[in-house]
């Protein structure tokens, strides 16, 4: 049924109609905490991807992928008879959504096949790339995930065109529903950017000074990176370089990596703009059911091959678009460039007074003059980019190596530690952006050691709440998106984490000094090479203190190692510092987000469910673990004991709450006596105001809720403490 005939925009079944978010758009939503559960996985809760992958014929898969590169299909023919450039773009656009500020995006979950990514304008026609892969995915089944296959295909594509690669690691399990946690922007129109610059700077139209809102890295809604025509479509290479630098830095790429990726990526393939985009139909998510997930139906001539429309630009960068070369940089500096229009009406650049020697993608008798994008010329017009580009031009081996390393980083930046990596092509060289942690090459502590260490820790004189606080501070840096942070490595003792305000540096220093002495004493008394890492000891100390506070056993799993300062990129790790952390009652609302929204966001990074979030906050409050030692949210007369008092007192109808300090904090007042009994934050009161969180809080606040709170808190605590111990699963 065509769009004009479709009456089902507001269906009266399957969840259609007006929703709560339509009535109350500012209401705190918990959807992001209910995603990617075992119930949503058709492979079942017992399926283990790492085990399935071990049975994969990896070399057979790579051979099939290499054969696919030149197996051009009539329904979507390959440019130049080779799909290499097409699949490089697919891999790039799958991984390239990663941003370092919040660790979200990237290719680690196979989200490229789900909305909105599968229908972004910048991903035009990549639905065909995924469809070309289906026979191979079908053949190998669940031994290879879509997430791994997308990126491995791009790697094989480069190899098949003579490019150097640095290696490849599999290990990305698929998810089975569209990601609902990532903030892609507030714009409501494709390719809009009014909100992301309005929220980031005073003058959103000044392309030379405006600031992109954090944590975004893309300059338009629906683009992976920058506008290839220039900022807002203005063909200004200098301003374009500014956008490029902002975007690539937020992807964790420095200037050299940025130049290598752009120059290397544009060595291959072409762009597509045979005619205006008015010839294109709906994107996959908006296409009719008979399209079977394919979108952008093209009414221009054949609608494929030489008539393809994607970006609207029509550029073939080199004379060897299916072979690695240095021609891209050679042409960039050899020619002067003049602004022209593509057949689709887009701004692009053509070499002045140059002969036509660039091959056509389909007609062997047709040649084109060299052409470039505004973003290409940015590498020549920006001084730093130009310097790097000229060095690569003069040193092709450096260029090839830099591209291989930057490409590897692009594909693996959100993979997490090497304990997650699978396959025979894992490079031996460790890179600083991997957040390396030494391998354990010594016996780890036994249960007897654990028991003895707990006794020594608890008698050390350090407040038990401070031990819990330190363990939480160490473990809760974990980000489920890019698998960074966590307790392994004990980076809480290193810059920059040791100096973060949220970690209360003076208190942290005292705790770490005491634990360091216990560590030294234990290690010096051992024979046979056994040692306890500070990373393990920090978590053990928290567990021991919690055990004392709860009166029940708390599990502990050893196996962490201590990273060095040299293994820690200070600038990169600075992205993990929280603006607000409701678990520790740190921070306050910003003009863009209330404190309770940031609490849920942090809970999502920790892969928590709504009940886990609720139990943890309520438990941490009565354990007296606020970052600054304040009584905010400590709704109990017996701080330091794990009880359900937080919920009992928050839900007490005899208490009324009055906002203070711009409604960031609230006084709990006895309705009869007007006595001020408590003070709480937005991160506290949300458990009584948000209906779904209140429902959970009522379970814990009931007369029979104390035992359940203790049980659930310890389970959630144990989960957080071990989030980055991926080896525990295997």
UniProtKB/Swiss-Prot annotation:
GO cellular component: cytosol
EC number of this enzyme: 1.11.1.21
Top-level taxonomic group: Eukaryota
Pfam family, one: peroxidase
Keyword annotations of the record: Cytoplasm, Heme, Hydrogen peroxide, Iron, Metal-binding, Oxidoreductase, Peroxidase
Cofactor note (record): Binds 1 heme b (iron(II)-protoporphyrin IX) group per monomer.
Catalytic activity field: H2O2 + AH2 = A + 2 H2O; 2 H2O2 = O2 + 2 H2O
Cofactor list: heme b
Active site: 93 (proton acceptor)
Main localisation: cytoplasm
SUPFAM superfamilies attached to this UniProt entry: Heme-dependent peroxidases
Disulfide bond positions: none
BP GO annotations: cellular response to hydrogen peroxide; hydrogen peroxide catabolic process
InterPro entries named in the record: Catalase_peroxidase, Haem_peroxidase, Haem_peroxidase_sf, Peroxidases_AS, Peroxidases_heam-ligand_BS
Annotated heme b binding sites: 266
Keyword Cytoplasm among UniProt keywords: yes
Principal EC category: oxidoreductase
PTM info: Formation of the three residue Trp-Tyr-Met cross-link is important for the catalase, but not the peroxidase activity of the enzyme.
Cross-link (Tryptophyl-tyrosyl-methioninium (Trp-Tyr) (with M-251)): 92-225
Keyword Nucleotide-binding: no
Cell location: Cytoplasm
Self-association state and partner proteins as the record states: Homodimer or homotetramer.
Record's function text: Bifunctional enzyme with both catalase and broad-spectrum peroxidase activity.
Family, as annotated: Belongs to the peroxidase family. Peroxidase/catalase subfamily.
Protein name as catalogued: Catalase-peroxidase
Organism expressing this protein natively: Blumeria hordei (Barley powdery mildew)
């Amino acid at each position: 049924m065509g769009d004009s005939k479709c009456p089902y925009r507001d269906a009266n079944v399957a969840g259609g109609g007006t929703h709560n978010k339509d009535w109350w758009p500012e209401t705190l939503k918990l959807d992001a905490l209910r995603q990617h559960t075992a119930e949503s996985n058709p492979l079942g809760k017992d399926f283990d991807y790492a085990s399935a992958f071990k049975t994969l014929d990896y070399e057979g898969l790579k051979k099939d992928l290499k054969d696919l590169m030149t197996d051009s299909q009539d329904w979507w023919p390959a440019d130049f008879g080779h799909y290499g450039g097409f699949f490089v773009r697919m891999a790039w656009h799958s991984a390239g959504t990663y941003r370092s500020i919040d660790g979200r995006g990237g290719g680690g979950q196979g989200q490229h096949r789900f909305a909105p990514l599968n229908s972004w304008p910048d991903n035009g026609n990549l639905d065909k790339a995924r469809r070309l892969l289906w026979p191979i995915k079908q053949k190998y089944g669940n031994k290879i995930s879509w997430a791994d296959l997308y990126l491995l295909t791009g790697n094989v594509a480069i190899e098949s065109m003579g490019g150097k690669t640095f290696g490849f690691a599999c290990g990305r399990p698929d998810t089975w529903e569209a990601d609902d946690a990532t903030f892609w922007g507030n714009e409501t129109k494709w390719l809009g950017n009014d909100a992301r610059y309005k929220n980031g700077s005073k003058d959103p139209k000044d392309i030379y000074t405006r600031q992109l809102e954090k944590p975004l890295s893309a300059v338009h809604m629906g683009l992976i990176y920058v506008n290839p025509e220039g900022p807002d479509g203005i063909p200004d290479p200098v301003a374009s370089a500014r956008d490029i630098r902002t975007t690539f830095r937020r992807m964790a790429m420095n200037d050299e990596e940025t130049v290598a990726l752009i120059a290397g990526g544009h060595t291959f393939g072409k762009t597509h703009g045979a005619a205006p985009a008015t010839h294109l139909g709906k994107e996959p998510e908006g296409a009719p059911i008979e399209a079977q997930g394919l979108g952008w139906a093209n009414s221009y001539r054949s609608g494929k091959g030489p008539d393809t429309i994607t970006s609207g630009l029509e550029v073939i960068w080199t004379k060897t678009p299916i072979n690695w070369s240095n021609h891209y940089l050679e042409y960039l500096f050899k020619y002067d460039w003049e602004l022209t229009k593509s057949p689709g009406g887009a701004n692009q650049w053509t070499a002045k007074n140059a002969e036509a020697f660039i091959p056509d993608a389909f007609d062997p008798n047709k040649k084109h003059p060299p052409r470039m994008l505004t973003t290409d010329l940015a590498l020549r017009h920006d001084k730093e980019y130009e310097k790097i580009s000229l060095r690569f031009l003069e040193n092709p081996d450096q260029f090839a190596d830099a591209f291989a390393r930057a490409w590897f980083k692009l594909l693996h930046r959100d993979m997490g530690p090497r304990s997650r990596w699978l396959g025979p092509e894992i490079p031996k060289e460790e890179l600083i952006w991997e957040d390396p942690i030494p391998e354990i090459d010594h016996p780890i502590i036994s249960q007897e050691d654990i028991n003895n260490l707990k006794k020594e820790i608890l008698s050390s004189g350090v407040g038990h709440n401070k031990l819990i606080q330190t363990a939480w501070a160490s473990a809760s840096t974990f980000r489920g998106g890019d698998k960074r942070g966590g307790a392994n490595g004990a980076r809480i003792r290193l810059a920059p984490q040791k100096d973060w305000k949220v970690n209360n540096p003076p208190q942290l220093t005292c705790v770490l000094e005491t634990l360091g002495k216990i560590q030294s004493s234990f290690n010096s008394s051992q024979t046979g090479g056994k040692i306890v890492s500070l990373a393990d000891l920090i978590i053990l100390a928290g567990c021991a203190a919690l055990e004392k506070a709860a009166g029940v056993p708390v599990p502990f799993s050893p196996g962490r190692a201590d990273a060095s300062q040299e293994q820690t990129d200070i600038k990169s790790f600075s992205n993990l510092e929280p603006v607000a952390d409701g678990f520790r009652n740190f921070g306050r609302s910003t003009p863009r987000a209330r404190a309770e929204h940031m609490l849920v966001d942090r809970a999502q990074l920790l892969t928590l469910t709504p009940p886990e979030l609720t139990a943890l906050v309520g438990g941490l409050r009565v354990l007296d673990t606020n970052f600054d030692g304040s009584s905010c949210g400590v709704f109990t007369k017996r701080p330091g004991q794990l009880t359900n008092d937080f919920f009992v007192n928050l839900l007490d109808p005899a208490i009324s709450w009055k906002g203070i300090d711009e409604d960031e904090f609230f006084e709990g007042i006895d309705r009869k006596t007007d006595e001020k009994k408590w003070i709480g934050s937005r991160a506290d009161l949300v458990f009584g105001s948000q209906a779904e969180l209140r429902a959970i809080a009522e379970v814990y606040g009931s007369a029979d809720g104390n035992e359940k709170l203790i049980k659930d808190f310890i389970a959630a605590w144990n989960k957080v403490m071990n989030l980055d111990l991926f080896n525990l699963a295997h």
